[in-house]
């Protein structure tokens, strides 16, 4: 005789977990500090989604020499940024900075980590003005040996800081002295005092990673930051007066014809002779 199983079947709950992706970079500044930036995303329901509210831990060093630098919560863009002062940073025997960004895991989000290893270096930017010629001299210095050493044959770019992003002004390659000179255009829009912020950058270098240096100079054209009503113009939000006036006249003429036609139809209907019954 077959036996029936009277026990209730247990429901197996399958919890979906997501593996986060950490994009991690370091930016070495001209004051010898380092910005650590991590962007955390995960593929959720087929869409790459930025993860907010996650605690990212930043450390420097390897194995037994690991030193905690700090913790940052990701913002609405999934980004966590930590600025590290020079006295917080330690290098290995090769003069490299070994950074790690790690996430311990939370709810359905799995743990993850990402490593970045770069040689210690510094980018310097010096403004030079000769008559009407404006230039900046950019120098790349290797600090991994403890003493400054010029780095030749390295590509870099110079930008001007704008409200939302930076505008590239030129690029160059360092010479044997580790220097490159880039010309700056005249009459760039500046702030109310005519100041512009110039940035020298090296991006994604195989040895040094990302480096940045900034300098502010009164080389721009003053642009008022006061809110003023713009004059009426074709390219503005307020058109010239002749445009709405012309439009109003044309629309009045068109709709006026319709009104006259409808009025005449009603008048003709009233004047239609009635047939005797």
Predicted regions: what they are:
Residues 3-19, 111-119:
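Proline/serine/threonine-rich low-complexity linkers at boundaries of modular beta-sandwich domains
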Residues 25-48, 56-58, 82, 130-147, ...:
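Beta-strand-rich structural segments
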Residues 55-70, 155-171:
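Short amphipathic beta-strand segments in non-cytosolic proteins
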Residues 74-84, 172-185:
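Glycine-centered loop-to-beta-strand initiation motif
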Residues 88-97, 188-197:
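Short glycine/proline/serine/threonine-rich loop/turn segments at secondary-structure transition edges
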Residues 96-109, 195-210:
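Enriched for extracellular/lumenal, surface-exposed ectodomains of secreted and cell-surface proteins
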Residues 106-117, 206-224:
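Edge beta-strands of extracellular beta-sandwich domains
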Residues 220-277:
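C-terminal single-pass membrane-anchor helix
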